[in-house]
Design a protein with these regions (language model features):
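Glycine- and aromatic-enriched membrane insertion/assembly motifs of diderm outer-membrane
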Residues: 46-91, 102-103, 117
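Extracellular loop and loop/strand-boundary signature of outer-membrane beta-barrel proteins
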Residues: 42-48, 91-97, 139-146, 212-215
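Outer-membrane beta-barrel translocator domains and adjoining extracellular loop/strand segments
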Residues: 37-44, 83-90, 132-140, 183-191, ...
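Short glycine/proline- and aromatic-enriched beta-strand/turn motifs that initiate or cap beta-hairpins
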Residues: 19-62, 219, 226, 230-249
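Outer-envelope beta-barrel architecture signal
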Residues: 21-25, 67-73, 116-120, 152, ...
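Structural signature of outer-membrane beta-barrel domains
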Residues: 32-36, 78-82, 127-131, 177-183, ...
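Residues on the lipid-exposed face of transmembrane beta-strands in outer-membrane beta-barrel proteins
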Residues: 27-31, 55-65, 77, 104-112, ...
Length: 249
């Protein structure tokens, strides 16, 4: 909530501070790699975290101070996955488990647009968990309670203008995201030595009562390629009463 209020305040102050600025809007969609990083899981030889994929789509509002500098506020629906391969034993074959977790992401980004059409963007992101499902074989179980409802992270991206006209254009880019906060909740085994993805005894077939030696945080990470369609919406101009107003193209 504080992040949203701060974002709105920054946007409103900016609107009243730059009389030659303009506002654009856009639609975007992306696809790429999504993973959950946990050092204990990644170092356990009987569990192989597989490279997993996800997708995202949504919209953006951008405040352009000039042709080079911009602040953007995105509203993104995202579906992420993490697949785990459990190694076989003498009595069981190898088997796979997948967790799909969906979120509503709001990144507030500073973007620098270069004169050659490329751009860089960086800033914080708050994510709101909207669902989580664990699938083993043909069985799917709701695991939303295993994960925290919010997560604060950071975004870094870059890309380039592809084609377009004066007010509408298409860009292509890569966006990297890392969540700073632990994604697991108490129900998922937070602060214990037996936590997701082995909190339901998945490792007992290898060693009865298996636990990790310590607790390590689980952090989301992703790298998605995006296509983004932008449209220049309106200029900010000073009215006769000294107020900043929008004048649409």
């Amino acid at each position: 909530m504080r992040f949203l209020l701060s974002s709105a305040l920054i946007f409103l102050i900016s609107l009243n501070s730059f009389s030659q600025a303009w506002v654009d809007c856009g639609l975007k969609g992306g696809y790429g790699v999504t993973n959950l990083i946990n050092t204990n899981v990644w170092n356990e030889p009987k569990i192989e975290p597989l490279i997993s994929t996800g997708y995202a789509y949504g919209g953006k509002l951008g405040l352009n101070f000039n042709i080079n500098y911009q602040i953007t506020l995105d509203f993104i629906a995202k579906s992420s996955n993490q697949r785990y391969l459990f190694e076989p034993t003498q009595t069981i074959d190898k088997w796979e488990k997948n967790v799909n977790y969906t979120s509503f992401d709001i990144p507030l980004l500073f973007r620098h647009n270069s004169d050659n059409g490329s751009f860089l963007e960086i800033g914080p992101q708050v994510s709101f968990l909207t669902g989580a499902t664990e699938t083993t074989g043909s069985n799917s179980i709701d695991r939303k309670d295993y994960f925290e409802t919010t997560n604060l992270g950071a975004v870094f991206g870059f890309g380039s203008f592809i084609f377009g006209g004066d007010n509408a254009y298409l860009v292509f880019g890569l966006r990297l995201h890392y969540g700073f906060q632990d994604l697991l909740s108490n129900a998922g085994g937070k602060n214990s030595n037996k936590y997701f993805p082995i909190n339901n005894g998945e490792m007992d077939v290898y060693e009865s009562g298996f636990e990790f030696n310590s607790y390590q945080t689980t952090n989301p990470i992703s790298g998605l390629v995006y296509l983004e369609f932008n449209y220049d919406l309106a200029y900010l101009v000073r009215s006769s009463c000294k107020r900043t107003v929008l004048r649409f193209f």
